[in-house]
A protein has these predicted regions:
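Terminal processing/anchoring signals of secreted or surface-associated proteins
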Residues: 1, 19-22, 137, 176, ...
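Short coil/turn segments at secondary-structure boundaries
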Residues: 57-66, 307-310, 393-394, 433-443
Length: 496
């Protein structure tokens, strides 16, 4: 970890020598790090990946990120009644400035660094380039999910085109899916010794695990499209016939997180304590949505006490209805995030949960898209979630429940299998992979019954964000027109 941390510091110094203020100058931003090499840049790129998931706006310390807004719109995260920290999100007030840093910094920080690796001209870096392709696909898919059409084919010209055209969202999805296949092929054909384990802060240079990660991302992308009517049977078949398999443990990144300023795990930076031991603003604000907390309480879910700690005022675990700013739900009367989420400032940063992989497989098997026993995969997903959060009793929780969103036999007898899978995925990833459970809610409508916040500006929950003001200012000729209802109209191709 110390070696990776040193590599990151060196790489950041190289990249920061001539950073540009032009945020979407992936075509020209961060200059051309001609003195750097993929082995130096990879750990810095992986650190940037972690930041995009949990702390994309580090300079302003806002905590804006894909996963935080996802947790809010999935009905998981709420705001303490005396903090008013997430009020615009809970009101469904979505402007061109809303969470704009997740667009801007995904391009300038994350995609730029991976693109540098992917296009590096010297020989001997095949596995680095394959990893870069996989991670570019990971982030670009999130941009498509969030915004629809995005710059892709012209987005990486290194200064030759600072106003890139927008590509059709489905065409981008198809292109990055193919890039995942190309990355797998590159790994299969890479000469031995083309990657040093100490320079890979995610999977320690285990290229078989990188192939599994790519295959699991492919499954995620295919299930996104399950309602489109597209004929994807051949792609599902290839997922199995390639013999790669799927991830069976959480994919995490840890470049050497430490309890020092600017070196903490970004999730902990946002929701935990400062290096001096003081609660952050988000720590004092972040609470469970009442609907989420009550579901766990009603089902005697052992994960409850890992996700939350008792309220300071009376020792009860209590959530808060979203957008409810009253004294009854002040911060000391509601439950902060618990030890299953906030371990310490050096904890690994989850990129993709092992439980998500199992729930993806359970859904695909239930739909008859891949072989496998959905019941077994579902129960394994619950067990993995318990393990990820440090809880025990997964088997009894599922088997003894009278709730058909928990007990598989009851779900099967009532035709509720899909909602059970998505609901358990929602619990497992609600605070960790908030973006994924938001997209699942858009795609499936599950979990059912999540209330629209009182005072929200729309009777339906958001599906998308708007193109940033900065993009409209610098690339207006190419930015697609968006209607007044664009944040709610399910305009990404797979949502329609």
């Amino acid at each position: 970890m110390k070696n990776i941390k040193n590599l990151i510091l060196l790489s950041i110094l190289m990249f920061s020598v001539s950073c540009s203020d032009d945020y979407l100058d992936v075509n020209g931003s961060s200059a051309n790090p001609s003195s750097s090499t993929p082995d130096l840049v990879l750990p810095a790129a992986q650190k940037n990946s972690a930041d995009m998931l949990y702390d994309a706006d580090k300079l302003n310390a806002s905590g804006d990120s894909f996963n935080r807004i996802g947790s809010i719109h999935a009905g998981v995260l709420a705001d303490a009644g005396d903090r008013v920290w997430y009020q615009p999100e809970q009101q469904y007030l979505i402007l061109n400035s809303t969470y704009s840093r997740i667009w801007e910094n995904t391009y300038t920080l994350t995609l730029f660094t991976y693109n540098f690796i992917e296009t590096f001209e010297a020989d001997g870096y095949d596995n680095y380039k394959a990893i870069a392709k996989i991670m570019k696909a990971f982030h670009i898919a999130m941009l498509v999910d969030t915004y629809g059409d995005i710059p892709y084919s012209e987005a990486f010209g290194r200064g030759s085109n600072t106003q890139p055209a927008y590509d059709d969202d489905q065409e981008v999805y198809d292109a990055i899916y193919n890039e995942l296949n190309t990355a797998i092929s590159m790994i299969d054909n890479a000469p031995p010794g083309t990657l040093t384990a100490s320079t890979d802060a995610m999977l320690g240079g285990d290229m078989d695990e990188w192939k599994k990660f790519a295959n699991t991302l492919k499954l995620r992308m295919l299930l996104r499209q399950v309602n489109t009517g597209a004929s994807l049977a051949a792609k599902y078949s290839e997922l199995i016939s390639n013999g790669i398999g799927f991830i069976d443990a959480t994919v995490s990144v840890n470049p050497g997180y430490a309890n020092q300023a600017n070196q903490q795990n970004p999730f902990y930076t946002v929701f935990g304590l400062t290096p001096g031991g003081n609660p952050t603003n988000n720590n004092q604000a972040a609470r469970g949505n009442e609907f989420f907390v009550e579901f766990l309480k009603d089902s005697d879910d052992p994960r409850l006490t890992q996700l939350f700690v008792p309220a300071a005022s009376d020792g009860e675990i209590r959530g808060i209805p979203q957008n409810n700013y009253t004294n009854a739900f002040r911060s000391d009367a509601t439950s902060p995030l618990g030890p299953g989420l906030l371990v310490d400032s050096t904890q690994d940063l989850q990129v993709m949960l092992g439980s998500e992989s199992l729930f993806l497989q359970a859904e695909a098997a239930f739909r008859g898209l891949i072989p496998g026993d959905p019941a077994s995969l579902y129960k394994s997903g619950i067990a993995a979630s318990f393990s990820e959060l440090g809880a025990t009793g997964a088997t009894a929780y599922e088997a003894d429940s009278f709730n058909n969103k928990i007990n598989w036999a009851l779900a099967s007898s009532s035709g509720n299998e899909l909602e059970a899978i998505i609901t358990q995925k929602w619990i497992a990833g609600g605070f960790i992979s908030g973006f994924e459970v938001w997209m699942d809610r858009v795609r499936t409508g599950f979990p059912s019954g999540i209330p629209i916040p009182v005072g929200a500006f729309s009777p339906i929950f958001p599906s998308n964000l708007l193109y940033p003001t900065s993009e409209i200012a610098t690339n207006s000729a190419n930015v697609p027109d968006q209607g007044d209802n664009a944040a709610f109209d399910r305009h990404t191709f797979w949502m329609q």
